[in-house]
Amino acid sequence: MFIKPKPTKPIPTEQKEIRKPDLKPLSRDHVLEHKTLKILSMEYVIEHGIDYEDEEIGWDEQYYHFICNSEGYFTGLIYKLDDNGNLMSYVFYKDGLKDGAEVEFYPSGKIHYYSVYRKGEITGIFYEWYENGLIKKYIDRIHDKRIEADEQGKITKQGKAD
């Protein structure tokens, strides 16, 4: 008597595709629309900050702390303007070290990058965008993630935060 063998399942020859993250939530417009970041107005920055070019501000001998005149280590908001009076960047300092948001702008006024510092070290999330608004670099130090993309939104690097 002949016994018919049971059919076997085909062996999959394709590997499962790795799911790539959706970069849309990292676009500048999406981040700003959903108020993920707080960006200060130029008026606020100028009213409450010090223009880097107008003050005698410099580094200490070890180039580690930021100082202001003979008053010692600087605490406050420093900003830079371009030749046309447009805001180029601003950053908060505490006791001579970056402490708080640092934001840099393109000449068009669009945000180039955003990062947060604590005691001179980048903490949390770092965003860098192309001028077209797509994410260039995203580093999440809390969840140890890093994504880099080209100007068309294609991921070029993905892995752990440095």
What is the meaning of each model-derived region?
Residues 1-162:
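Glycine/tyrosine- and acidic-biased, solvent-exposed loop/turn segments at the edges of beta-strands
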